[in-house]
Regions:
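Amphipathic alpha-helical polymerization modules
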Residues: 1-140, 213-218
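Polar, low-complexity export/assembly segments characteristic of proteins
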Residues: 16, 23, 27-30, 34, ...
Length: 218
């Protein structure tokens, strides 16, 4: 077979192109530190690498979720501790009332109790990362409305979102879930319906406040 100069040139160019591609591949491996930079380099290895990258991405997401949940739970514990402490302080104030108390002393106790009820409402409206932790799935607005009577300073707590019966709307009672591992979801919140015992706590605070108001009336 006769080899023409044209054939030789084409063969030469193919060899040069092949060598350049090989050099470019090696250069990419050196600069990126990766043996496989695209699927065509090594399809089998490329698939394995993509699978590993997906697993790494999932693990990073799970770790981020766990960190978020831990912060949320810490904030929940702090808020509930505050509610518990304030409730105990209200009980102490009430048990300190003596039959010999005059109106001024009763007004002082009433003022302290109402201030603590207000602080309990603020604790129920605790937020973490811009989300209200006791709001169920309604995380963008406080779950509790703190009403203060302008005349006598009496404080009452009510659900911000209620139905016709005065009960919290479904969103306030929702649970929040997050994925912490493959196939494992974790419910990480307490909603206001749970922590207020379906609003019974609000009723008790209101009864206490009203009773003190009656004892301090002129």
């Amino acid at each position: 077979m006769r080899v023409t100069s044209n054939n030789m040139m084409n063969s030469y160019l193919k060899d040069v192109q092949k060598n350049l591609q090989g050099m470019n591949k090696i250069n990419n491996q050196i600069s990126t530190g990766n043996q496989v930079n695209k699927v065509s380099d090594d399809p089998l290895k490329a698939v394995k690498i993509m699978n590993l990258n997906n697993e790494i991405s999932d693990i990073e997401r799970y770790n981020s979720n766990v960190d978020e949940v831990n912060g949320w739970l810490d904030m929940t514990d702090n808020a509930l501790d505050k509610v518990g402490t304030l409730s105990s302080e209200i009980k102490t104030l009430l048990t300190s009332i003596s039959g010999t108390f005059g109106k001024d002393e009763m007004k002082a106790v009433s003022s302290e109790v109402n201030e603590k009820i207000k602080q309990i409402g603020e604790a129920f409206n605790t937020s973490y990362g811009g989300k209200y932790i006791f709001g169920g799935s309604i995380t963008d607005e406080p779950p509790v409305k703190v009403n203060v009577d302008e005349n006598d300073g009496t404080v009452s707590l009510v659900f911000r979102n209620t139905n016709d019966e005065g009960k919290p709307n479904k969103g306030l009672s929702d649970n929040l879930n997050v994925s912490v591992s493959n196939g494992i979801n974790f419910n990480y919140n307490l909603n206001i319906n749970e922590v207020s015992n379906s609003g019974d706590a609000f009723d008790i605070f209101e009864e206490v406040s009203d009773a003190l108001k009656g004892d301090t009336a002129d």
